[in-house]
Curated annotation (Swiss-Prot):
Compositionally biased region (Polar residues): 256-267
Pfam families per UniProt: zf-C2H2, zf-C2H2_15
GO biological processes: positive regulation of transcription by RNA polymerase II
Modification sites for N-acetylmethionine: M1
Stated name of the protein: Flt3-interacting zinc finger protein 1
Naturally occurring in which organism (per UniProt): Mus musculus (Mouse)
Length: 500
């Protein structure tokens, strides 16, 4: 017998829709409240529940109501403790398939969520949200409002709210100008969307380079790379860029130089420094591995002065005046970059670093086995990668003369010229700054494949992995029990001393 106290839910009415064209997909079920169209009657019934405040599916234990029966089924598992969705890599279980999918990212290392400003990727939506709030506060435009100068976006699809021609329902939306179709994109029909889904490919394809995207707004931003449109302008030097990531990378040059930076010095083919003008500065900064911050050198020596010419006072160089003039003109704000990405505050420091690229690798790291040609390069590697201070290292062969005194670049390594924009701390190298920034972003990019924990630095992960293994390098000489770290062994020995 039916309960008369329950309210009667009005049945959804299939409103008559517009006459379908020959190419339009068949969506015969229309909502009488908002006019949206659906391909199946079950989708229309599920959608119609949004227009009513009724939640007919109630939990028999806590009384909470749900609009759909499958939502109630998932909720009941919170009372029973049932976790039918098991992970194949670890013994963890989950109440629904969504939780299992989010967990599997821990084992696969996949990072499906990408920041559209700096192109960093994250494993969860919450991590991406924290990154956007901390690093790009107020810099992100509305998802449906393109930046000035970009090709105009179409308005959202009336069925699924996607921007541009819809890959789900085939709707074209109300175009604003040419929209995305004028941006070299192919058509977005149901056939293409189904083929892309079957091949696990994003549905939006660029007609110029065949690159695919998950959303129409990403395709619109990407299309600027194929055109002369550069809507992103640097507020300091008025240079234009066609992508926000390129603009953020360019801003680092101003941060490294400071607000009152000297003119850029570029070594020309003639051998002397030239002050680059506005047009030259734009050409230099266009290369992906060059910066507007100082002397541009290459370890191969092609088209640049020789290594001896960089050190002032050397005899036998064919052009002594040009390097000397460059050394006098350099200041504390001028940085010198090697092609490997390392910055130096002086030309002698860079010249000493270049020996690590050209000379024989005779100095070995006792931690990872990396070989270096110069002792200074080995000390920098041990300090940056393994957290050790400057110490003596025994070379594999002869040539330990550099261990007796500081190298040419030792004074520059003591300077802290790389600053954090969040807490204003200074660091000696870009690597140290990158490691420190992880404290502010909360990122932990090193996962443990055994238990799923994440760590901020690789050394922390290596130490944690000992927990899953049988190796215990620090044994107790009294009871024979082994420990992973020396600090744990010290605490254990205090127990023996307390029992004695």
């Amino acid at each position: 017998m039916e309960d008369s106290s329950l309210p009667v839910v009005p049945a959804p009415i299939a409103a008559p829709g517009p006459a379908p064209s020959a190419t339009a997909p068949r969506v015969p079920f229309h909502c009488s409240e908002c006019g949206k169209s659906f391909r199946y009657r079950s989708d229309l019934r599920r959608h119609f529940a949004r227009h009513t405040a009724l939640k007919p599916h109630a939990c028999p234990r806590c009384g909470k109501g749900f609009k759909h029966s499958f939502n109630l089924a998932n909720h009941l598992r919170s009372h029973t403790g049932e976790r039918p969705y098991r992970c194949s890599a670890c013994p963890k279980g989950f109440r629904d398939s969504t939780g299992l999918l989010h967990h599997q990212v821990v084992h696969t290392g996949e990072k499906p969520y990408c920041c559209l400003v700096c192109e960093l990727r994250f494993s969860s939506r919450s991590s991406l949200g924290r990154h956007l709030k901390r690093q790009h506060r107020g810099t992100l435009p509305s998802p449906l409002q393109p930046s000035p100068g970009l090709p105009p976006l179409s308005s959202p699809c009336s069925v699924c709210c996607n921007v541009g021609p819809c890959s789900v329902c085939g709707g074209g939306g109300s175009s604003g100008g040419e929209g995305l179709e004028g941006a070299g994109a192919t058509s977005w029909g149901l056939a293409e969307a189904a083929a892309a889904a079957a091949a696990s490919l994003p549905p939006f394809a660029c007609g110029a380079c065949a690159r695919r995207f998950d959303h129409g707004r990403e395709l619109a931003a990407h299309w600027a790379a194929h055109t002369d449109v550069k809507p992103f302008k640097c507020p300091r030097c008025e240079r234009d860029f066609n992508a926000p990531a390129l603009l953020e990378r360019h801003k680092l040059t101003h941060d490294l130089q400071g607000s009152n930076a000297p003119p850029t010095q570029v070594w020309a083919s003639g051998g002397g420094p030239e002050v680059a003008g506005e047009g030259d500065a734009s050409e230099v900064g266009a290369a992906p591995q060059t910066w507007d911050a100082g002397l541009l050198l290459s370890p191969t020596g092609a088209g640049v002065p020789k290594l001896e010419a960089l050190l002032p006072g050397d005899e036998g160089s064919g052009n002594d005046q040009a390097p000397a003039a460059a050394a006098e003109a350099s200041s504390e704000d001028t940085l010198y970059q090697c092609d490997c990405g390392t910055f130096f505050a002086s030309a002698p420091a860079l010249a000493s670093h270049l020996e690590a690229h050209s000379g024989p690798a005779t100095y070995g790291c006792g931690h990872c086995g990396a070989l270096y040609a110069a002792l200074a390069a080995l000390e920098e590697h041990r300090r940056a990668s393994h957290g050790e201070g400057s110490g003596e290292a025994a070379p594999d062969g002869e040539g330990n003369q550099a261990a007796g005194g500081p190298g040419p670049g030792s004074s520059s390594r003591s300077k802290k010229i790389f600053g954090c924009s969040e807490c204003e701390k200074l660091f000696r190298s870009p690597r140290d700054l990158e490691r420190h920034v992880l404290v502010h972003t909360g990122e932990k990019p090193f996962p443990c494949l055994e238990c799923g924990k994440f760590f901020r630095h690789e050394c922390y992960l290596k130490r944690h992995r000992l927990l899953h293994g049988t190796e215990r390098p620090f044994p107790c000489h009294i009871c024979g029990k082994g420990f992973i770290t020396l600090s744990n062994l010290s605490r254990h020995l205090k127990l023996h001393r307390g029992m004695d």
